Amino acid sequence: MDRNTLFSILLNNFGFTPTEGQAKVLYHLSAFILTEKERPLYLLRGYAGTGKTTLVSTLVKTLPQIGMRYQLLAPTGRAAKVMSSYTGKPASTLHRKLYRFQAVANGELRMTRDVNKHKNTVFIVDECSMISDQGDGYSWSRSLLDDLIEYVFSGSCCKLLLIGDSAQLPPVGLDISPAMDFDILRNSFNLTIATYEMKEVMRQALESGILHNATEIRNKIAMSNEQWAMSDFDGYELPLLNINNFDDIIKIDPMSFEELLWQSFGDKRSNNDAVVICRSNKRANMFNQAIRSRVLQEEGELSAGDKLMVVKNNYFWTSQQDNETTRQQVAETQRRRVAESQSTINNPFQSPSPFQSPSPIPNISFIANGDMIEIMKINKFEELYGFHFADVEIQLMDYEDAPSLSVKILLETLHSDSPALTNDEAKRLYQAVEEDYMDIPKASDRRKAMKENPYFNALQVKYGYALTCHKTQGGQWNNVFVEAPYLPEETILELGDLRWLYTAITRASEKVYLVNFKDEWFM
């Protein structure tokens, strides 16, 4: 097949007349898919509303038609769920795809990068602005970006498509998003690389107040980047936002705010379609307490039905737990999918492509930072080692068919103003647990035994109703309440403020409610 033929297939599958930028990307993709060069990577950057998701859906539809496979990946479970929603196909998190447990000589399970057994496969990764090139302290990982690239290109005839928006917040602790930076990718990895940035927002998208304001902020970020590079950026002065004649981005007063919180969070069965985005963990704690006490009318620290976010990767509960319920649920899911597959085979009008990537049973090898969970049942509360714990049954909310798990959670992080346990708190817990193992004389044996302690491995969580902007990144909610960012100088916005606000308002699919924004913000 030649490039022009594939381009025609892509255009036909696109379904309507593409914008100039979309047409260019489709033409680039036709070359990218067919290239036989070593380690091919295509970096697709784009503003919100430029149609990146439509392009991905078109590619996913086209690849099986030409005998190629694909894998859909994203940094978090929420981002993978969004990707699966707009493509109609299963998507996985990067961590669940890249890593696995491996037994080492002493019988201990250790995390390691998995082997890429895929052939002739395009790995499509969304929300790449979240991917860091910094190590996270684990000996088995250089960095998520390193591991992703080396995993993909260790397979036979595999290609990598990175998609994202460079205007969003970079990974915590970084000034830029390395996976969105052409020069970093080109200089740090041995790649055949091409890139394109989509800037033309679709006309119908600009009818949305959310995307209208996002585009204006995005343009100011681009301008600020140029000035910052020349050391000529002193901040951007308010006003910034235009909410006139739009019904999807609204400034609200305190009374309306409380009423809208009731509407959004009052029913535990459906309150996972809204989020409050805050400027700090301290502010998120305040909003979470208010929502639980005044809206949900919860008096206890934890209740069945509570939605929580995991704030630190946890490898203990899924690797150590001999969970018969889990095995039965996975087996039942497998039987159901086999039955569905047989039904499809027997129906000539539903013949699937032999090249379509299969819908995988969820990989529950660990519980990831950023995973949303729901408390299904509370078995007991207890206090030990100077900390408070709860034994609970949880459901992973962002993974279809994921089995329930029995875990122990640490309650201190629910109210902490830090992202997770502080270093001092973690040290205090470690030392308290270690006291129970001092009869083991050898330090290495003692540490190994401590790794099996359920209290030491308790899941660190926060309430999931109000979150910091970084914690919402990659996710999407119907209704998003955005608290005004803190400005030391009341009318001057730094580049980071622009990125923060851009990321926050683009989390909404239907409505943005602006909370505590002064009149100076508005045109």
Where in the sequence are the language-model features?
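Short, conserved phosphate/pyrophosphate- and ester-handling motifs at nucleotide-, phospho-/glycolipid
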Residues: 22, 76, 280, 474
